[in-house]
Amino acid sequence: MAHKKGAASTKNGRDSNSQRLGVKRYGGQVVNAGEIIVRQRGTHFHPGSGVGRGGDDTLFALVAGAVQFGTRRGRRVVNIVPGE
């Protein structure tokens, strides 16, 4: 007979990689055109003036300026206030 118990197998021990979502540039921060403002799944934030939306719902700056968060028709929107 064995004096040591055989090592048991387990079906656990895995986890998926984080998606690194969230706001990347906050209100008042100055951004250049093309910079990512928000990484999101679905439209938690909607694009406003000077902001574009990618195929994965990522919001990015179309123009250089300061980031501004607000609401429009009950939706959270992100605008870019162009710099002088």
Curated annotation (Swiss-Prot):
Q: Which SUPFAM superfamilies match?
A: Ribosomal L27 protein-like
Which BP terms from GO are recorded?
A: translation
Q: Which Gene3D superfamilies match?
A: 2.40.50.100
User: Where are its TM segments located?
Assistant: none
Determine if Mitochondrion is one of this entry's keywords.
no
- Give the UniProt entry's GO cellular component terms: cytosolic large ribosomal subunit
Annotated region Disordered: the residues are 1-24
Show the ranges annotated as biased composition (Polar residues). Answer: 9-20
Question: Its Gene Ontology molecular function terms?
Answer: structural constituent of ribosome
Query: What's the protein name?
Result: Large ribosomal subunit protein bL27
Supply the source organism for this entry.
Nocardioides sp. (strain ATCC BAA-499 / JS614)
